[in-house]
Amino acid sequence: MIKNIENKKISITYEDKNIILPEEIKEKIKKGWQEFKSKNPVLYNGEVTCVNKYESNDTKINISCQKSNFAHYLYDERIGLPLEYSCINISAGALLETSDGYYLIGELDEKMSYPHVLQISGGNVDKKDIENGIVNIMKTISREVMEEVNINLYDNSQVSSLKLKYIYETEQNEKPKVKIFAKANLKITSEEMKNHYNVYLEYLKKNNLEIEFGKIHLLKKNNAIEILENMSNPKREYLIPLVTADLSNC
């Protein structure tokens, strides 16, 4: 479920402490990782920030986090673990809209852990986003957008408005996770964005740098839901609800 959080205070704290898992669970994760790695050798088992406490009311949201690793997260995502041992992921991103009313949707590169999945620009909280035990979620968002599509959210020549606006809270029958989204209106048109990204993509290829989006899709707002529903690519579970929520706020 997508909720508007423009008028809520958000506090995200981080404790530099590993989530405790029983040996049996650790062994399952280890075997699972070996299998995932054999199918996709470029996978990297880096540190992951996981939610261990989430509280929300009408005026504020408090989130507490600890650390685990990508093997734990991926095993839980693909195979599943009991809730008490789950790696409840916290991530953030930005729904980008061009000046002529197109949403920017990224398609993950074939070398990523979820190839060809459609999503907005964003990703997981990183250690560099944490200062004195506080997660700066806007730092996560701006970093990911810069890495993925080479847009500086704080550059007034590129962006006309930026707001922390939405949160995705999983339904009762869904895998628990927390996703926070900003909305950014760009000063460039869809055609300019397409050209901008193509230049950036060539730069990444030329310098042998990581490519997160193999391609981008620019979807006219009034047709975005229909287009997404007709695309055969797998999609992040939040994507259509997020676009629907934003359209209802227009």
Where do the model's predicted regions map?
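N-terminal leader/linker segments that precede catalytic domains of diphosphate-processing enzymes
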Residues: 1-120, 124-143, 151-250
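Active-site recognition of the HExxH zinc-binding catalytic motif
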Residues: 147
